[in-house]
Amino acid sequence: MRQRTSEDVQSAVRTFSLSTLITASRAFLAFSLFFLIVKDEYSIALSIFLLGVASDFLDGHIARKRGEDSSLGGFFDHSCDALFVTTGFLALAISGSETYFLIGLIPISFIEYSWDFITNRTPLTPTFIGRFNGISYYVLIGIWLGVKALDAEISFEFENVLVFCARFLCFTTLFSIFVGIQNRIAVKF
């Protein structure tokens, strides 16, 4: 049996840290967000969404400030982000918004991005396009929810802009996946 090291103990302590609990709350908020959107409770869903955004902002800040940041914590944070935005887009698609094409791409992109961490425990290395996509997923869901929560009559043109943005995100997500795969292949050869 392997001896426990101080690194094992520190890792276990970080597992149950405040920042990790804040990150985990986003996973629970994702399911609430999903059901509220599907039930057309957009005002409450927007509030839950904003809590999720706040948790995403706070968890990393708190982890760094308290010395709780780790590769595993970063992976967990990105996992919760992917779950949160994927369930948000899934719920919006079920409620009639044209976001269905992102539902499969976001998890694929997350797996591609996380592959080296999962297989080799190498640190996650975000790219510009990956950051752009991650932020844009949140922004697009927020705009869609804001419009629905306000029960605003949106013009056909504005709806087309939202659909265009979602399709553009589909393109940039595919681009990010292919760049990640290409970089991984280039490193091996």
Where are the regions that the model predicts?
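A feature for the membrane-embedded catalytic helix bundles of lipid/isoprenoid biosynthetic enzymes
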Residues: 1-16, 78-189
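Membrane-embedded alpha-helical segments that form the functional core of polytopic membrane enzymes
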Residues: 20-75, 88-91, 98-107, 156-175
